[in-house]
Amino acid sequence: MKNKNPFNIFFPLSLDKIENLEKIKKNCSSIQYAWLSGYFWNLANQTPSRLICEKNEFFRKDNEEKIITIISASQTGNARQLAKRFNKYLKNENKKTNLIDAADYNFKKIKNERFLILIISTQGEGEPPEEALSFYKFIMSKKAPRLENLHYSVFGLGDVSYNLFCQAGKDFDKRFSELGGKSLLHRLDSDIEYESNYIQWSEELLLAINKIDVSTCSVFKKNDKKNFIDKLNYTKYKPAVATVLLNQKITGRNSTKDVHHIELDITNSNIVYTPGDALGVWYQNSSQLIKQILKLLSIRISDKVKVKDKIITIFEALKKNFELTTNTKHIIQKYTDVTQNKFLKKIISDNKKLNNYVKKTPLLKMIYDHPKKLSSQQLISILRPLKPRLYSISSSQSEMNDEVHITVGVVKKQISGTIHLGGSSSYLSQFLKIDDSVKIFVEEKSNFRLPENKDVPIIMIGSGTGIAPFRAFIQQRDNDKATGKNWIFFGNPNFTEDFLYQLEWQKYLKKKLLTKMSLAWSRDQKEKIYVQDKIRENGKELWEWVNQGAQIYVCGNASKMAKDVEKELLDVFSKNGSMDIEESSEFLNNLRITRRYQRDVY
């Protein structure tokens, strides 16, 4: 039995053809060899494009046409938007692509990939986004396959003010290399101002792909540097304008929290959203805060400054273009450079002191403690560009039609007797009035979705404003007349002051749409009770729901509540499912892979 020849461009003849050549070879003289050489060379002496096409034909005969897989792993939507842009960019170069979210990617088949592009953000303490957790755990495990045939590139998105800047991208890049993958292009770690980095990276990466991939016969031509942005109705950089219908405080007067329910009219925007999505809001800085900063730096509000090739007043620039409520190590370092302040020089020379100073010192306080006369251009050179903030949508469009609702917790910090407010949360809760306009866009959260099967039970776990998406969920279940059971765990400090949307939840309980509600009030008694305590208390029943196919949803703080909840879920599975901790962890990971465990954490 003859073995098949591994037919490829480096050895492009089948065994039968080689045998025929051997027969000819036996009966030829040296002169005939020379003539045959010239004859075949003449046939081969064609245009490069023709040769490339013929070469490609060889690949098509024995292999499927190579597809470039583009994976987005996004926390706030930036990675997803860049992945969409890069996908369109490649398609315009006649490349075959497969654009997919990390949550939908079948990572166990990664060994079959030839080209893989990963665009990934980092959350928390250097962790991958929620939708990439399963992929991350798999690729870091002993189960990960060798990737000698893989050509890859990683584009990392992050915030340079964090110690573990772009760590998720770094981890994937290192691991792909350890498994034998070949990097098409050096990994790019990009801060929030990523546009110019992306354009250069995308062009260089296309060139790198073209050196290896000849699956198309088109001649490469340099693209317009603008690249292609998907023509969505509304995006982060092309937001819709909504009108405020209602802005109502929903915590009690004695509450330690200030939470507002905000309703926006989207009648004229044709915006479409789904329960689980987030609403992006472009906020404006407080006029009072701007005036305080300018006064301390001896800058007139009418001074002109250049922003994005436009000349505007410094007041207008600070109002809409720069962050004023967030301090970072880079801002402190830049402010130290322009002021040459001795105290700040000592701070930045010690990383531990610098980290502590960042946590305790807002931008305004730093300037107040160390004022210096600056020019308007010097001021904006140290600031970060303003970013929109994302809020979980707390309404179902099926119920609310031309409205979108959000639940906003005001960020407050008291430092040295002064209250410092969050820029976006204070803008939404305190400055927006009825009929005011606000710029918005929808950030799709495809990995935080209700089950398609309306008979499937769901378990919702949230604390504080983490209840917001579950209000949308229950409205949708009501509209769909879903028959699946619904159980919510909710925690906040006090029953009388902090029971968000109390009357609505009681209504759903009364009509038996809400099957069960487990409440945790941390300050209503001496011993603090949190949602994880309620999970432990109801562990046996929760395990029964899981065995009935229930999907689990968690929304809230990533570093505290969500971690404590996950730890308790692992313990519940271990105790009630007769598993050790490793088996329990594997069980939870399988729930995540099958979309039965979904989180929206921040």
Curated annotation (Swiss-Prot):
GO terms for cellular component: cytosol. It is an enzyme of class 1 (oxidoreductase). FAD binds at residues 325, 359, 389-392, 407-409, 422-425, 602. The keyword Oxidoreductase applies. Residues 68-206 form the Flavodoxin-like domain. Its EC number is 1.8.1.2. It catalyses: hydrogen sulfide + 3 NADP(+) + 3 H2O = sulfite + 3 NADPH + 4 H(+). Residues 237-451 form the FAD-binding FR-type domain. Its cofactor is FAD; FMN. Keywords: Amino-acid biosynthesis, Cysteine biosynthesis, Electron transport, FAD, Flavoprotein, FMN, NADP, Oxidoreductase, Transport. NADP(+) binds at residues 522-523, 528-532, 564. HAMAP family: CysJ. NCBIfam families: cysJ. PANTHER family: NADPH OXIDOREDUCTASE A, NITRIC OXIDE SYNTHASE-RELATED. Belongs to the NADPH-dependent sulphite reductase flavoprotein subunit CysJ family. In the N-terminal section; belongs to the flavodoxin family. This is Sulfite reductase [NADPH] flavoprotein alpha-component.
